[in-house]
Amino acid sequence: IKGFTNLFYGGSIVLLVLVLVIGKTVNGAQGWIDLGVISLQPAEIAKVATIMMMGQKLEEMEGNINTVKNFFTLAIYAVIPAALIVIQPDMGMTMVLFFMVLGVYFIGGLDKRVILYGLGSMLLAVVLLWNSGLIQDYQKTRITSFMNPDTDTSDSGYHLRQSLIGIGSGGFFGAHNSYSNDGTGGFASEYVPEVETDFIFAQIGEQWGTIGAIILLSFYGILISRMIKIAKNSKDIFGRCVSIGMVSYFFFAITQNI
């Protein structure tokens, strides 16, 4: 797939621009292109394309990332798609891309102090952009509710509070059947509405109990460890970058949803 990197990256940028013109808005972000039968989210394509492009460029640099020129060259390829995703605005997807890029810089041997500065800069950016309009009200609510779920358990903190109750109700072996009886084939939950979205782990804890949650986390651990092994065994820089980028993506996604 290395030979298609430029085309893949360029195409993803075109799609990110296109979605700002003709895209439809879902959950406050204009990030989807309606193709009739299915909908396409260009940001998902851009995440993989960006990691591929950075891997290709890092390979051309022979892995030498600790120069000002090389550092900012790689950064440009990450900033372009990130900026287009921020405009949608989709801060969640931007965060995912950030951690994937951070993984590439890490595997590239970037000075660890620079990585720490990058994390600090991200936190500072959130503070500075808090009232800029780029961070939507619902995103602010999710952040504040996560930090203190007991602030408003009837509104902003409701889902998080209910998810904890649901997990606790599962006990060791689980509480009740996993699927609803309304003919939709959807998940059932006595405590969390729309549990199949960001609170799927609460569903596992409620339906399958502690044992089910442990099994799921064990599978995640095996998946991540295998992906890291693949990254270590990659014969070129491009392969390592793509592999570790995907490790970063899965790790962040798993952490975010648990």
Model region roles, listed by residue range:
Residues I1-R161, A202-I258:
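Hydrophobic alpha-helical transmembrane segments of multi-pass inner membrane proteins, especially
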Residues H159-H176:
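Extracytosolic (periplasmic/ER-lumenal) interhelical loops and adjacent juxtamembrane/interface segments
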Residues F172-W208:
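Long extracytoplasmic/lumenal interhelical loops at the membrane interface
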